[in-house]
Amino acid sequence: MAKIALPRKFFGRRTEILEPPYLLSIPKNSFENFVQLKVNPYKRKNVGLEHIFRTSFPFKDPDENFILEYLGYEIGDWECNRCGYKPKDDLLGGWDVDCPECGAKLVYKEKFTPEECKLKGLTYSAPLRVMLQLKAKTKNGYRTFPPRKVYFGEVPLMTDNGSFIINGTERIIINQLIRSSGVFFDEKEEKQKDATITRILYRASIIPDKGSRVEFELSGATDLISARIDRKKLSAISVLRAFGLETAYDILKPFYEGVRKYIVKDKYLYDAETGEEFTPEDLEHHYIFAILKFKAKIAGFGTSKEREIIEERYIEEWEELVRILDDERIEVLSVTSVPRENVIKSPYGKSLVDTLATDTSPRDADRRSPVKVPAEYTLRDYGLMEMYKKLRHIEALTMEIDSIIERARVYFNVFFRDLKRYDLSRVGRVKINAKVHNIPKVLKPTDIDLLDNLPPLALAEDYGEYKAGTRITKELLKELFKNYKEIKVKDYTEDEARFLLPIDLINILKYLIDLRHGRVKKDDIAHLGNRRVRSVGELLENQARLGIAKMEKVFRDRSATIHPEQPDLKPQDFINPRYVTNAIADFLKTGQLSQYLDNTNPLSELTHKRRLSALGPGGLTRESAKFEIRDVHPSHYGRICPIETPEGQNIGLVTSPTVYARVNEYGFLITPYRKVENGRVTDKIEWLAAYEEENYVIAQSTPTDEEGRIKAEFVLARHKNDIRLVKPEQVDYIDVSPRQVISPSSSLIPFLEHDDANRALMGSNMQRQAVPLIFTQAPLVGTGMEKKIARDSHAVVVAKRGGVVEEVDGSKIIVRVNPEEINLEDPLDIGIDIYELRKFERTNQKTCVNQRPIVKKGERVEKGQIIADGHSTDRGELALGKDVLVAFMPWRGYNFEDAIVISERLVKEDVYTSIHIEELEVEARETKVGDEEITRQIPGVPERALAHLDEHGIVRVGTYVKPGDILVGKVTPKGETRLTPEEKLLQAIFGEKTKDVKDASLRCPPGVEGIVIDVQVFTRKGGKAAKDMLAQKVEREELEALERELEKKKNLLMSGVEKVLKGLILGKKTDKDVKIGKKEIKKGTEITEEIFKEYSQYILARPENFFTDEELIKKIREIYTRSRTQIDMLQKVYQEKKETLLKRRDLPPGVITLVKVFIANKRKIKVGDKMAGRHGNKGVISVVLPVEDMPFLPDGTPVDIVLNPLGVPSRMNVGQILETHLGWAAKELGKKIGEMIEKGRDRKAITEYLKEIYAVGDENGENAKFIEEFLNSLSEEEFWSVVRDYAQRGIPMATPAFEGADEKAVKELLKKAGLPESGKTTLYDGRTGEPFDFEVTVGYMHMLKLIHMVDDKIHARATGPYSLVTQQPLGGRAQFGGQRLGEMEVWALEAHGAAYTLQEMLTVKSDDVEGRSKVYEAIVKGKYTYTPGIPESFKVLVRELKGLSLNVKCMNGEEKPCDQVEIKEEEEK
């Protein structure tokens, strides 16, 4: 049986209503949406790359001589496995595409696997080919060229575990958390001339995804509304007119009751809707606006000719209207009025009317309103003109008004009605709709007229032939209401819905006025409803869009130089296709959000891939981010972890999504809740974004009865960022799980609820720094999340399909797949799954990845079962540290200030030993003076220094190397020198120069020692390298490995075929006499094992010679045909790989050979290493004590670690104490089971005892029932194996966050284990044997060894490299630098009067170049005197002064320039 993880005793609910989603879904789904690799290229959704290409093409040049249209794209090389067909220019290869030749599905051909890319320093990518069609203008229309696939370059692909491999290193793209597009309302203090008065300015900002930012401002001082576009101030009314709210009637109607529009006939007013007659006097106490038409001159015409103009004018009194009606020169087109009383009573007050009145009031002496425009135009044109003049700084007198209006129309259409320039995006539309439009979820027949006052809507579900997402019109609704009583609707987010609409502006102004009157609150920038996640796909999409914009520019430029009548034009003639892929590749290599993957252990890898950052392009900066944005916000609940964030300047800006958080289609974080109906909790799950949950009452996870009713009379619930007690009937939703609030890292901390948040933060961060150990051990006290994290981080190997383990060793597992799971369509599926295990691989942090199988040969495995452990995992569970026996007590001052005392047992038994792998590489390059060479012949190096190198000069695997040892011998040509006659003679005889070379070997750097575990040699194929012995050796080894792989697969295939054949014919009798060579099988002979073994190949090839049963013969023939096809396919794949291997050039230009050497270093735990628990309890080892000196328990067991008890009270992380108690109980209960086995207890007694343990603290009896079912399902052998595991390891516990074990349960378990309920015991001093005065808390705690190891920190320099300019020693361990002697250190030496020491420090030990060499010579000769010279930094200072044209001379008798003079000390007289 496989080594399975023992089932944990759960203190929370064993079964969750909803399991946490796949933890890497955010980046992986985002990237899949970007490339849509697993979608048929002809059926791709309009997202990601497809969306960019569709919206950017067709390209047109200004004269429209050429049009370049987009037809589709393919990623990767595709081929038919059956007939070998490769797609031509007219077919896009891709998922689910049929081969036109034979009808089979095309298959993706991977050039290199991610593992090969890591080894060879390549980028894991696939070619992107875009199918484009060119059209060229001719006299008779357009000439269409056949479509062509254009190679756009390589697109980096995401590996299965969510990372990218760029030039051999694993990198990831961080998810960015940025402000979303949409409308935002805020308020700030308005500057007043009188500093004592403060007034508030209310602002509505409409932020699009791309394009100009439109803002409306309502002044608290004047109550007038103004607008800004890209920060430039202009009239709000002009902006409303430009967007389609043309007249006073259009603007005022949505805001006030009683707004009427009148038509004028014979000086009487008639209501435009009802036809009712009014006189001007009836409009007393009304606001009156009139549209007039008359002849006048308009400034800026350039001619004095009068034109008919129309103007809109505010008329203060009705008498003024009478005068205008009486004036025969003026034609009144329409009048709009609104009663003053209605305005005052209206919730929207006078703001809008006053703004409109101010804008249209007569201002000049001629009593003319400024709002006027020639009669052939409209008032909207006036708005467009005003907007254009302000934004483009056009003066009215400089241009004809007609041309200004024409340009203004074009300007508006380009900048506000073209998706390339202005796009609210789907997110922006959804946000605006949610904020200012009250959109019903369901429309009824009475709601048809509502459509006029709503933004565009779409069907939320399929209704007959009308699919979900179809745009709703009145006609469509009328049609649907014939068959349906109500229609579910959602936001429509395409086409004009992505522009700013008049209805948006009306509702935004309504909301702004509501904000002014305190009816609504301003927006909170930190609220997650206003912030969204830009994941990998979207970030790459933005880069690709920039590349396409450059490409379009090139298209325009090139099309100007090509004649449309030219024959044989190709898309490549017009574009530079690399822009798109180059933009993506550059972003992955150097982008702010592209980071070097932190894969110290599986948890750090998982967390890094899920990380959210508010920094990066378009985001915040560390300096500008205020406290509010960094702080925990109520909307983070269930979405962002309140605990896990870095300490330091990034605190609160870099965060982690919670266990259950997902991202919705608009990029907002969503979290699941269970629906509550009338106080009864249902199993219906709904995922809500932060902006959706505002209106609901949401309770935390609360106990319920059998019917699902909430037990408590009052429950704690959240509503609109407020927490309060409510009755169960008021609750709308309830949390899915108590773990919903925290991230995977935090969810691994047991008793999290008993830790102070600051320490929990350190605990969750330090778990990510735990080093994978050689021997792993899952924690005794866990939280139940260990398995989920191990699986989702891809550290363990999971069976892809069910089957039987055919073969297993340390490096691979071979599973013969269940027949029903074999894909018969794919000839390459031979029914065998081979899992290559990762062996001693180096991570980015130099830790070691090593996978170990946990299944045995012949064992049956199910799909999804864990079949191999990885680094830091144990039986499929995350195992970051070890459970060790700890005691909380001071020990002779050695654990002062968080220091840790450890036992020598941890060193001797390799408890905390880890492997670290150093990778060193050397290149042999082509140089101008000749080629570098990897060789054993190194000038000036004695033979003993080369003893560990092979014949090619490369270190042998298994050698123990120390700093300074040669790893790879390399020589470099020195350059051309004049040859002596002897050398010329030798050259003439042997035709080769005598080598004039210098040693450039790769040596083991300081601080690195260990065993060489692997050497990899890469040589360039072809050219000079082909003659090289080393290159031939490497090629031979690679080909042999390929052949071995082919043979292995053939053998596995044939053994599978034989098994199937055996099942068909074993025991059957032959129907004919068969003669094979000299041997003969008689008719009626039964086919036994021996006969089958000898003749199976003959039966397979010619079944008709043995049998007459047609059905049987047909089956055997099918088996034979399929096996032959598969062998042919395997041979073909081998051939392809061989060809690739023989012709490829993997190395960068100029490199002949690349050698990588991997050195493994086994590090035992030692003084100076950092250790930590899971509760933020960290410390540095101060002493390693012999086992006999450690304090010991009454039974003689010495403790492993002594921690300082003073580290607990002030830190308030009591969780560590509870973990210690529970860990002790768990271990001792295991020992009790061991005693029962020794006493020979039967299976039933042990099962009952385990049930008792598992029942502790379990109200529902779930645990006892579970363990009973589990143990009963095991065979006798499996049962005793599991029980022995319990005895050896202890009873594993799981105490999930916020529903963990309580004090009562811990005490009960301690009691059952026969331990004191206080968790304390008497300890004895290992040195004296005396008991300590007080009882001490003792128990098992999961302690981690962190990556901050003393071996990486300690550093000492004697001599080493110097800076080029100042000649001072370099700084830092990496540069093998020295210690800085700063100003304060100089003062100290001065204060002590240590003049000679100081002189030494400032001269010969630093940058006195001549003095340094003189000191060396003196020491060699045994003299210890020296003469200091001028420090180089002084000379640098002098040269810098000369650079400022200041000549400095030294006045010591010789007036030489300072950087040449020698300062001589006066000789002693």
From Swiss-Prot:
Its job: DNA-dependent RNA polymerase catalyzes the transcription of DNA into RNA using the four ribonucleoside triphosphates as substrates.
Quaternary state and interactors: The RNAP catalytic core consists of 2 alpha, 1 beta, 1 beta' and 1 omega subunit. When a sigma factor is associated with the core the holoenzyme is formed, which can initiate transcription.
Organism of this sequence: Aquifex pyrophilus
CDD domains noted in UniProt: RNA_pol_B_RPB2
GO biological process, one term: DNA-templated transcription
Gene Ontology terms for molecular function: DNA binding; DNA-directed RNA polymerase activity; ribonucleoside binding
SUPFAM superfamilies, alphabetized: beta and beta-prime subunits of DNA dependent RNA-polymerase
HAMAP family: RNApol_bact_RpoB (MF_01321)
Keywords associated with the record: DNA-directed RNA polymerase, Nucleotidyltransferase, Transcription, Transferase
Family of this protein: Belongs to the RNA polymerase beta chain family.
Keyword Nucleotidyltransferase assigned: yes
One matching Pfam family: RNA_pol_Rpb2_7
Enzyme Commission code(s) on record: 2.7.7.6
GO CC terms in record: DNA-directed RNA polymerase complex
Protein name (record): DNA-directed RNA polymerase subunit beta
Record's keyword annotation contains Disulfide bond: no
Enzyme class: transferase
Catalytic activity, as annotated: RNA(n) + a ribonucleoside 5'-triphosphate = RNA(n+1) + diphosphate
Stored InterPro entries: DNA-dir_RNA_pol_bsu_ext_1_sf (IPR042107), DNA-dir_RNA_pol_bsu_external_1 (IPR019462), DNA-dir_RNA_pol_su2 (IPR015712), DNA-dir_RNAP_su2_dom (IPR007120), DNA-dir_RNAP_su2_hyb_sf (IPR037033), RNA_pol_bsu_bac (IPR010243), RNA_pol_bsu_CS (IPR007121), RNA_pol_bsu_protrusion (IPR007644)
